[in-house]
A protein has these predicted regions:
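Long, well-ordered mid-to-C-terminal structural blocks that present hydrophobic/aromatic surfaces
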Residues: 193-234, 238
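Generic hydrophobic-segment detector
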Residues: 4, 8, 26, 30-31, ...
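Hydrophobic, well-ordered secondary-structure elements that form the walls
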Residues: 212, 260, 321
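Alpha-helical transmembrane bundles of multi-pass secondary active transporters
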Residues: 28, 42-206, 281, 285, ...
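A long, glycine-enriched binding/interface module in the latter
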Residues: 273-274, 285-287
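Helix-loop-helix junctions within the multi-pass membrane cores of secondary transporters/permeases
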Residues: 2-54, 222-279, 295
Length: 332
């Protein structure tokens, strides 16, 4: 729940900035910032978390089952973003309206999928996302294996088997202490901060083009690299902080969960908002942006599939982000 709240309010800022940019007709900036947020969370945030956490704890673990489910969801997001662009590139005579209709239909599907993932993680299969429960189940499974071995020895030395068997029994009276959840005040603080950001976002959007020209940067680099890093700095710091506290499950849920929410919620909502604001917003991204997203998803899935991380894996993610950032910087 903590990771979901952090991701939701963090992406609320992203959504507000994107809505203001969309209202001003800056469609290229909106799409670039969406692509950059996905790339930044998967490579920069997760890379920093694994690298700094790995330097302190040598090796850290998180739930591989959740990592694989997140990987499948990200693969779906890549497919959903790729197909409208692929159709536009491979078919002739496709107008803006047809592209918008396809993007709207895809947006509805993605929002529905995200709703189902919330139902899966918070209702029907909560035990898979509870780190404490998962660890306990792993210990029980190991205990069952050890118990079988002890019983085999017990056929030869019953006395010894009994003493070891008793050690494997779990005291039913031992229950984890429950602490009251006082999250309501903090939700209010996050909500107030989000509202404050809404007022400041308009000034950011208005000064974006002028600042880009003064710094001599191309719009693609600004939208994909600079804007997401600045807009999600607090969320990035939280994920890294959790890794430094050896809470890698929460760190991964913030990094990957944020990317999923952007791909499955924020982007579709912006497509639907385009109809209301009278802007031709669709999911037809630049091919180079899609290649960068696909590369980010591929390397992140490869590294996180085993549910274990170290500083070298974090360094690999950071190196991939640096290569992509340089590519966007020199992109004409």
């Amino acid at each position: 729940m903590g990771g979901l709240l952090n991701v939701t309010f963090g992406n609320a800022t992203e959504l507000i900035v994107a809505l203001i940019a969309l209202k001003e007709g800056l469609l290229g900036v909106v799409k670039s910032s969406l692509a950059g947020s996905i790339i930044g969370n998967l490579l920069l945030v997760m890379g920093l978390s694994m690298f700094l956490g790995g330097l302190r704890y040598k090796s850290q673990t998180f739930q591989p089952v959740v990592a694989r489910m997140n990987a499948s969801s990200m693969n779906l997001a890549v497919i959903a973003l790729l197909l409208p662009t692929a159709m536009n590139l491979t078919s002739s005579g496709i107008g803006v309206e047809l592209s918008r209709h396809l993007s709207t239909a895809v947006a509805v599907v993605l929002i529905g999928v995200y709703g189902m993932t919330l139902l899966f993680s918070m209702k029907t299969h909560t035990y898979l996302f509870d780190a404490a429960t998962a660890s306990k189940e792993g210990a029980v499974a190991e205990g069952a294996v050890a118990k079988g071995a002890v019983e085999a020895v017990g056929a030869i030395a019953p006395g010894n088997a009994k003493s070891h068997n008793e050690e494997l029994k779990e005291d039913p009276k031992e229950k984890p202490k429950e602490h009251g959840n006082h999250i309501s005040p903090w939700v209010g603080v996050l909500l107030a901060a989000t509202i404050a950001v809404a007022f400041e976002s308009e000034f950011l959007v208005m000064s974006l083009e002028a600042a880009t020209e003064q710094l001599g940067l191309n719009k693609l680099f600004t939208g994909v690299i600079l804007l997401p890093v600045i807009g999600n700095a607090a969320e990035h710091a939280t994920a890294v902080g959790m890794a430094l506290k050896n809470k890698m499950d929460l760190s991964v849920s913030i990094a990957v969960g944020s990317s999923l929410q952007i791909a499955l919620v924020v982007a579709p909502v912006l497509v639907l908002a385009g109809w209301v604001l009278g802007q031709p917003m669709d999911l037809n991204f630049q091919p180079f942006e899609l290649v960068a997203i696909a590369v980010s998803v591929f390397i992140t899935n490869s590294i996180s599939s085993d549910g274990e991380s170290n500083w070298l894996e974090g360094l690999l993610l950071l190196a991939a982000y640096a290569v992509l950032a340089l590519s966007f910087f020199f992109h004409p």
